[in-house]
Each structure stands twice: as structure tokens, then as C-alpha cells.
Amino acid sequence: MANYSFTVRAEWDHEAELWYVADSDIPGLAAEAPTTEALLVKLRILIPELVELNRHLISVNIDPYLQIHLMSERIEQMIWY
């Protein structure tokens, strides 16, 4: 159903206790949220808006269906001794 898939890589900011967009193939995408689920809610709003604004930078014919591939990474450090 989805014509085009956008990849968004989210990372955990331990100090701020937030997930944030670390990288994406969508020009201008920036967002943060306390959970990946909350981040996805924001992305569902932001991505269509940015696709419309940046249509001249995205060289594909996009239909009404967009797919979001959200990859998250969280690295924890701990004292083991």
C-alpha cells in the first residue's frame, strides 16, 4: 500500500531522558519525545507536512500513503564492579 518509505533513526538522550531524531532521509525533520510511541505520534504529523514542504527535494512520485521505518537505539552504561 505504501508507495514510499522514510527511515527515521531515533536515539535515547540519557541526560534529557528523551528519544530524539538522530538521522532521517526527510529534510528538516527534528523531534523529541519521552517514549518511542510518543515520538511516532509526532512523526505521523510532521512527516506529511515536511514531505509537502520539501516535495522539490524528494525525487519520487509520492501517493497518499507514506511508510515510516522508525529504528531506535539505546545504549546504557553501568558500573560492573
Question: Can you say where each PLM-predicted feature lies in the sequence?
Answer:
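Short aromatic-glycine-(Arg/Gly/Cys) micro-motifs in beta-strand/loop hairpins
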Residues: 11-25
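A short, exposed loop/beta-hairpin motif centered on an aromatic-Gly-Thr core
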Residues: 27-38
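Short, charged, surface-exposed hinge/linker loops at domain edges
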Residues: 1-9, 15, 37-81
